Amino acid sequence: MNRRSFAQSVGSAVALSALAGSSTWAQSKSNAAPGRMMAIAAHPGDGLFTMGAVLAQQIQLGGAGALLSLSLGERGAPKDIPVQQYGEMQRTATQKAAHLLGAEAIFLSYPDAEIPFNEESTLQVCDAIRQYKPDVVVTHWSGSWHKDHQNCHLIVRDAVFYAGLETLARSNPAHGVAKMYYAENWEDATNFVVDTYVNIEPIYEKWLQACDFYPMWRGQTGFFRYNDYYSSLAVMRGCLSGVKHAAALMSDPGQRMQRLQSL
């Protein structure tokens, strides 16, 4: 196998131009636009840094996108900014970023570091899914050291189930989510296995501009070099998938089954 073939096949990952059913970098022969995508994150930064690029690409290709943040991530505040003030800065940054990308910003009100996995939180996310009606949901992988990320994963899995349950009466009718993916996040790396690449080159610079609204992206919180990590990660994933910049995802195990007459 030559180097080009290896780079395009490494990891046996599926390369997608958008999360719309195409299995190669080439655009689908169908003229159908990509569907609606909802990125559901524990904190706004997680949503934009790890899910924002695929959300922006979906919108760029004619789909629609929404970013749901379960908390404001206010406890990541630097020492010189009060926690509540930093939370509002996070909200404002998310609204500006979503506007730039053409997405809708939605917020729940759970305190940072205290997002609960219970019926109330699950039904709130279920209601958001039923209201927005996404075809694709992207969220956290379970293999995280962060309690909020772990709970967000569990909440979303159950919320997707509830959203599609016709016998569960809520304010909006049932809605089935066709596909679910998990985003690559430095905090959620345990047992994360890439099987899907999205070419984000068309929106890469716009995504960087959206991320730059966040103080933590600009290095003002001093905790982690988010800008260096995620911008470099997009380059690395692009190298492995044969494009300039890419985002890597893990598909839900329940949608990996193939039914073939032959190989």
Indicate where each model-derived feature is located.
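Active-site rim/loop-helix segments in enzyme catalytic domains that contact anionic ligands
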Residues: 7-17, 26-132, 250, 254, ...
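Residues within the helices of the helix-turn-helix
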Residues: 4
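Metal-dependent de-N-acetylase/amidase catalytic core
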Residues: 7-12, 27-36, 40, 116-263
